[in-house]
């Protein structure tokens, strides 16, 4: 579920990175992402940022999943933008902190497996291209 960063910036509109952040895209396909604490990033006018006030009640990493699902239900897209007002109006039910931790742990393991599988496919594609280049050029 987590996305690779793109682009580099020497500054950010944020100056406090001591808390984790949940980001969502305003334009295009509906996407939600988690940025860990102390990880620098620069939000643009094409995304929104949520900072959980109390991680003892709601885990930021957990919030990514129900926010993703709710955005899909709302059919957020380029035509139906996920403005801060629309995000603010969402009602998301969250289970106990123990259940949130369990969900995060299980899904993090699966996300890691997906990441490894994507890397395997990328490596295989590169190996295939190298063979094609060697014998067909």
What are these regions (language model features)?
Residues 74-78:
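A short linear hydrophobic-aromatic micro-motif
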Residues 16, 38-40, 66, 79, ...:
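Generic preference for flexible, low-structure residues
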Residues 2-68, 72, 83-87:
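A short beta-sheet element
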Residues 72-73, 113:
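A general structural signal for well-ordered secondary-structure junctions
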Residues 93-137:
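Amphipathic alpha-helical coiled-coil/heptad-repeat segments
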